[in-house]
């Protein structure tokens, strides 16, 4: 009897031990499943609909200016990188390690962050080692696959991939909408296309001096009449280069959350001898800045022209319609004056002076028409002095 009792107890012991071992195995598997990184650890997401804007990245690279305001208040990192992902902190002071694989536009980039509060979702902008030359030379939008790997603490990394559209350097980001459809104006990026240090500027100024309208460029030193002569010398020089007017080139970007405007760089404008209202305004602004006359880019719905201060106190603001540089029909601007018929028999110099005066008159009329909207920062308007303060925020893209 005692023998059988021992056998029974022995079997019971092994059953209990097996049950314990089984529970331990199940618990370990469950712990592994629930503790390992999951596919929803983070989500690659951005506010620009999967678009990257080289002009915005390049123009703020050395200034650190934050023009773009992320839609999430809880963001970490440099938002101007435009690349981002969302992640919820599993615990307080959560450390994460981020690696972004290399692409033609940036090198492999590594960064570390601390997520302060548990259960709070953060928008994280990794550090990016940009290839600025590749960005500046990107002439058309191209797709690029961006691979981001995130490790939480000592856990294994989770990798996600998203395809972005790297826009042309000629696309200027002018605004975007957040999730609540609030619009954020980023028109300051137009300043990136004003390039007073372009290598061709000296040659253009020499051509303007060769017109003998002025002997030298002195900026604001000799009064307003001399300022007007200097501006006209630039005007006459550009007209002699036979620029032609081309209609406004809207971006091919199709989006209801991000908006851009195509702008020719100074290189492009000089090479093609074609300008629209935006191209002409940034071209003239580049030349004005080069001779120490402060220009102002003025945008109204569907149009842009350039202004400039003719005095040191910035009390006298003048305006110029740059599209009249090209071979245009003056009757389109002043239909009641029949100017085209009056132009017959006039020399190039006489026609240049006529169009210059009319370009000032037309732009002044347009400014007064939209003055209240411009000063009130109404929709699709912009008043952007290309001043030292603006240059401290936005640098030229260098083309």
Predicted regions and their residues:
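Extracytoplasmic/secretory-pathway proteins
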Residues: 170-201, 221-228, 327-330, 336, ...
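Beta-strand-enriched, solvent-exposed domains that form extended recognition/catalytic surfaces
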Residues: 36-175
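N-terminal Lys/Arg-rich, disordered targeting/topogenic segments
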Residues: 1-12
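Alpha-helical and coiled-coil interaction segments, frequently adjacent to or embedded
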Residues: 83-89, 93-108, 161-165, 181, ...
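Hydrophobic membrane-insertion alpha-helices, especially the h-region
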Residues: 15-31
């Amino acid at each position: 009897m005692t023998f059988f009792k021992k056998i029974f107890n022995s079997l019971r012991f092994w059953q209990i031990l097996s049950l314990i071992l089984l529970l331990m195995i199940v618990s370990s598997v469950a712990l592994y499943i629930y503790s390992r990184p999951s596919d929803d650890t983070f989500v690659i997401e951005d506010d620009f609909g999967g678009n990257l804007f080289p002009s915005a990245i390049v123009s703020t690279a050395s200034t650190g200016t934050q023009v773009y305001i992320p839609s999430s208040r809880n963001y970490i990192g440099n938002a101007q990188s435009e690349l981002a992902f969302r992640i919820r902190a599993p615990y307080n002071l959560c450390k994460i390690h981020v690696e972004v694989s290399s692409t033609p536009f940036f090198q492999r980039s590594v960064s570390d962050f601390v997520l302060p509060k548990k259960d709070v979702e953060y928008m994280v902008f990794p550090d990016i080692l940009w290839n600025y030359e590749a960005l500046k030379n990107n002439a058309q939008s191209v797709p690029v696959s961006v691979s981001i790997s995130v490790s939480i603490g000592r856990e294994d990394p989770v990798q996600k991939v998203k395809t972005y559209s790297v826009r042309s350097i000629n696309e200027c980001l002018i605004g975007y909408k957040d999730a609540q459809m609030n619009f954020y104006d980023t028109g300051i990026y137009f300043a990136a296309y004003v390039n007073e240090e372009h290598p061709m500027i000296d040659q253009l100024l020499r051509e303007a001096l060769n017109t003998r309208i002025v002997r030298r460029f002195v900026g604001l030193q000799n009064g307003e009449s001399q300022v007007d002569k200097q501006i006209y010398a630039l005007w006459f020089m550009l007209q002699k280069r036979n620029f032609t007017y081309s209609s406004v080139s809207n971006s091919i970007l199709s989006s209801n959350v991000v908006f851009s405007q195509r702008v020719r760089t100074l290189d492009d404008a000089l090479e093609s001898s074609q300008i629209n209202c935006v191209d002409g305004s940034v071209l003239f602004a580049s030349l004005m800045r080069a001779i120490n006359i402060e220009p102002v880019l003025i945008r109204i719905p569907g149009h842009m022209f350039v202004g400039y201060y003719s005095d040191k106190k910035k009390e006298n603001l003048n305006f110029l319609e740059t599209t009249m540089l090209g071979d245009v029909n003056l009757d389109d601007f002043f239909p009641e004056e029949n100017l085209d018929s009056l132009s017959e028999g006039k020399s190039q110099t006489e026609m240049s002076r006529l169009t210059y005066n009319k370009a000032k008159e037309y732009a002044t009329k347009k400014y007064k028409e939209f003055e209240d909207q411009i000063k009130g920062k109404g929709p699709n308007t912009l008043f952007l002095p290309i001043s030292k303060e603006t240059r401290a925020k936005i640098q030229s893209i260098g083309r």
